């Protein structure tokens, strides 16, 4: 009897592992509806943390904010010391706030702020949580808790975790604070780190490296690789529209005087966003090659 049960239980584990593999393949292929269907079936018999987390991620990719929030909240309650769950809960709540009315957004401010703060407290090296707090304090009006001073503080914390992230963060805050010369100085400092960049864990950093490479015409080949990585790994959580990445990649190819590839990517940018003025200007520059 024990042998029969063992084989039966092993079969369940295999099915679960196979389903997880299929889900990962669908997610990598950006076939989120197929991933969702598999996970909804799997969660009926296997409501594990892994399945819930993956389903919450898929809901967020599909912009099903309420469904994602429900699952992330369950995970936060079940694992209150998991920094990533707090961050994701705050991040998805922020996306819901951005997609609705200002009145609804005001009611979510506390949840967003507290989730990011909790994540940063639980993990002193949590890069995404600090970026979330920087965005939060720069986006929210002062009367509702916005604070440039606090944004600078978290940018400084990022600098102690990762110098290149810190310089990008400080540049971002300076731009929002109208300190463009100081922002430029921070962007220039990021260039010192680019030649030694190996694996990039945070996809938004791929975009920033590609952007600064194009803006200052430095390390263009690396910039192209990183921007392609950003596009390949892109999800809605990355924040920057794909049209912007296509435009940046076209600009990088123009700097290499590669008209063929520049045209491919600038056309993708304009097809993705027809009124993209910067991309239209870039296409005119490409035509002069």
Predicted regions: what they are:
Residues 14-63, 287-289:
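N-terminal leader/linker segments that initiate helical-solenoid repeat arrays
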Residues 21, 54, 88, 95, ...:
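"A position-specific structural signal for the A-helix of alpha-solenoid helical repeats
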Residues 26, 59, 93, 100, ...:
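Residue at a conserved register position within TPR or TPR-like alpha-solenoid repeats
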Residues 29, 62, 96, 140, ...:
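Structural motif corresponding to the intra-repeat A-B loop/turn of tetratricopeptide repeats
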Residues 44-45, 78-79, 122, 158-161, ...:
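Structural marker of alpha-solenoid helical repeat scaffolds
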Residues 46, 80, 87, 107, ...:
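Residue signature of alpha-solenoid helical repeat architecture, marking inter-repeat boundaries
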Residues 51-52, 85, 129, 166-168, ...:
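TPR alpha-solenoid repeat register
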